[in-house]
C-alpha cells in the first residue's frame, strides 16, 4: 500500500487513485530559456522514479510535464540572443530532452507547450471573469484573491501573513489591482513583444494560469497527483489551486508532492556564489547514470548535497551494482530470502517513495547475490528494483562475439555481399561498436 506525504494536509496519506489501477500525474516542467541546472534535474529524476515505482507495482501512469515557452525570462533571453522566443524555447526544449535522456528519465506521456493552449487559456480566463473571480484592468486581467476561500492553504498561510512582494510585483502592477495580492491571469503586451489577441487586447498568459489550463485540459478537473519543486509551493501551486477550483468548483489535485532542494558543498546554489551548475555542463565530465544515482540516494522530499565526494561515491556504488549483475548464475537460491528482499524493497518505496531505504535493500541484496545466490528469478527481481531508480545496464558485447561478427562481415565483403556486410556494421554500431577499415585490417572500438 503506497503512502504519500501530501503537502496540503502535511500528513502521510494512503494513495487512492481516482480510477482503479491508473494514476494521473502532472509535474511542472522547466521554463525553457536556458539549460536546466541540477535542481531542475532533481525534480525530473524524483518524479520519474515515482512514476517508475507506480509502474513497478502495476499502475498505468499518465505522466504529464509541461514546457513553459511563454514567459518574461524567455522574452528577455530571446531579445539578448537576437532570436524569436519560439526559436529560443525550441532550442532549450531540445536540450532538456537530451539532458534528461542522459539521466535515464522516461519520456512523459505528453509534454504540453503553453503556445499550443492560448485559446484554452483565454477561455479559462473568461470563465473566471464571468464568475466574478477575475477582473480586467488596463488590458491586464487579475485574479481576486479575497474571493478564494482558504487561499494559500497549500502553503499553510493566511492572507494577512503573505508578503505583498511574494510574486515579484512592481509598483505599476500594484496600482492596477484591487488588492496587492491579486495575481495576473493575462498580461497586456508591450510593443514588440510576443502576444496574442484577446478580449482584453493583445497580450500573453500569466505564469500560473498556464499549468492550470494544461493540466485540466489533458487530465480533467481533478487529478491524482500534482508535483514540482518545493519552491513552487507558493505562489505558483497556491495560485494554480485558487484559479482552478474557482473555475470548476472541484478539488484540483488529491495529492500535492514537492521535492527538496539541491545544495552545492552545503551552500544554496546561485550564480552569485559561482556554484551554479547546469546539467549540460556536468554531463561533460560525469556520467548521466552516476548523476541520477546520486540524486536517488536521498528521499525526494529531503535536501541533498552535491559534492565531488558524493558523486565519486555514486560512481563506485554503481560499479559495484554492475559487477553484481555480471556474476555467473547459480543453480539455486533461497526463494524465501528472495521474497523477503522484494517485500523489504516494496515496504521502503511504499513509504512515500523512500529511495534511501530502497537503495539500502538493493545493496543488501547485492551482498547476498555475491555470496552465491544468483538464479534467473533473483536476477530478474534485482534488475526490476534497479530499473525503478532508472538504473539499466546495457550488456556489453563480448569481444569473442565482436570478432566473430567482423569475420562474418569480412567473408561477406570477399563474396561481394555488401548488403550483409553493411547490415553487420549497422548491427555492431547499434551495440556501440565502431569499425575502422584500415590497410592493416579491421580495427574496432567501443563508441
Swiss-Prot record:
Binding site for Zn(2+): 28, 211, 236, 240
SMART domains recorded: DALR_2 (SM00840)
GO cellular component: cytosol
Record text on cofactor binding: Binds 1 zinc ion per subunit.
EC numbers on record: 6.1.1.16
PANTHER family: CYSTEINE--TRNA LIGASE, CYTOPLASMIC, CYSTEINYL-TRNA SYNTHETASE
Family: Belongs to the class-I aminoacyl-tRNA synthetase family.
Name of this protein: Cysteine--tRNA ligase
Gene coding for it: cysS
Amino acid at each position: 500500500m503506497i503512502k504519500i506525504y501530501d503537502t496540503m494536509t502535511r500528513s502521510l496519506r494512503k494513495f487512492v487513485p481516482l480510477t482503479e489501477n491508473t494514476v494521473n500525474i502532472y509535474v511542472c516542467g522547466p521554463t525553457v530559456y536556458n539549460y536546466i541546472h541540477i535542481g531542475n534535474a532533481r525534480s525530473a529524476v524524483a518524479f520519474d522514479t515515482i512514476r517508475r515505482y507506480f509502474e513497478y507495482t502495476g499502475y498505468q501512469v499518465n505522466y504529464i510535464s509541461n514546457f513553459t515557452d511563454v514567459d518574461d525570462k524567455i522574452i528577455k533571453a530571446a531579445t539578448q540572443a537576437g532570436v524569436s522566443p519560439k526559436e529560443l524555447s525550441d532550442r532549450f526544449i531540445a536540450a532538456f530532452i537530451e539532458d534528461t535522456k542522459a539521466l535515464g528519465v522516461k519520456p512523459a506521456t505528453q509534454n504540453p507547450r503553453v503556445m499550443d493552449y492560448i485559446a484554452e487559456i483565454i477561455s479559462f480566463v473568461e470563465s473566471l471573469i464571468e464568475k466574478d473571480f477575475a477582473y480586467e484592468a488596463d488590458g491586464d486581467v487579475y485574479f481576486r484573491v479575497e474571493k478564494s476561500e482558504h487561499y494559500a492553504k497549500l502553503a499553510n498561510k493566511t492572507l494577512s501573513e503573505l508578503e505583498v512582494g511574494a510574486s515579484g510585483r512592481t509598483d505599476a502592477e500594484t496600482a492596477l489591482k484591487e488588492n496587492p495580492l491579486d495575481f495576473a491571469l493575462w498580461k497586456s503586451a508591450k510593443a514588440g513583444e510576443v502576444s496574442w489577441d484577446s478580449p482584453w487586447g493583445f497580450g500573453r498568459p500569466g505564469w500560473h494560469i498556464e499549468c492550470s489550463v494544461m493540466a485540466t485540459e489533458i487530465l480533467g478537473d481533478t487529478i491524482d497527483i500534482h508535483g514540482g519543486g518545493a519552491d513552487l509551493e507558493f505562489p505558483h501551486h497556491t495560485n494554480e489551486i485558487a484559479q482552478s477550483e474557482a473555475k470548476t468548483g472541484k478539488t484540483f489535485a488529491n495529492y500535492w508532492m514537492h521535492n527538496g532542494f539541491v545544495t552545492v558543498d552545503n551552500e544554496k546554489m546561485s550564480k552569485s556564489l559561482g556554484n551554479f551548475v547546469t546539467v549540460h555542463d556536468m554531463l561533460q565530465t560525469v556520467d548521466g547514470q552516476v548523476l541520477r544515482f546520486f540524486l536517488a540516494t536521498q528521499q525526494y522530499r529531503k535536501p541533498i548535497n552535491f559534492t565531488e565526494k558524493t558523486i565519486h561515491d555514486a560512481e563506485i556504488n554503481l560499479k559495484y551494482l554492475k559487477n553484481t549483475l555480471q556474476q555467473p548464475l547459480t543453480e539455486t537460491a533461497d526463494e524465501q530470502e528472495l521474497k523477503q528482499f522484494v517485500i523489504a524493497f516494496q515496504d521502503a518505496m511504499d513509504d512515500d517513495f523512500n529511495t534511501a531505504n530502497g537503495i539500502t535493500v538493493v545493496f543488501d541484496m547485492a551482498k547476498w547475490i555475491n555470496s552465491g545466490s544468483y538464479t534467473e528469478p533473483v536476477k530478474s527481481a534485482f534488475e526490476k528494483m534497479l530499473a525503478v531508480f532508472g538504473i539499466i545496464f546495457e550488456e556489453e558485447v563480448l569481444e569473442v562475439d565482436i570478432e566473430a561478427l567482423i569475420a562474418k562481415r569480412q567473408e561477406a565483403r570477399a563474396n561481394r555481399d555488401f548488403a550483409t556486410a553493411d547490415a553487420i556494421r549497422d548491427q555492431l554500431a547499434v551495440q556501440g561498436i565502431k569499425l575502422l577499415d584500415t590497410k592493416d585490417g579491421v580495427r574496432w572500438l567501443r563508441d
